């Protein structure tokens, strides 16, 4: 088990803002995006100066895939299938903690 402290993003404003404009995201923290239903998700890094990694997570808490994202990129990073959650963390956190597709998270 690897603990992580997360901010929750649920409202439309929180979901669309994410980590935009934040210069520092402490190690061991992340942002969990919570959707009302399973859907294909798309994220970009506009106005986000910190390199991030993202996990796309099923409604049962299984990580389906992880991807790295480039600061300030306008390119979309999309889930390959409908998911319920996404977790953004400092880039490399998943790899460092040996977490990837098939891993499960305990959801709030």
Where are these regions (language model features)?
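Compact, glycine-rich, soluble single-domain proteins
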Residues: 1-108
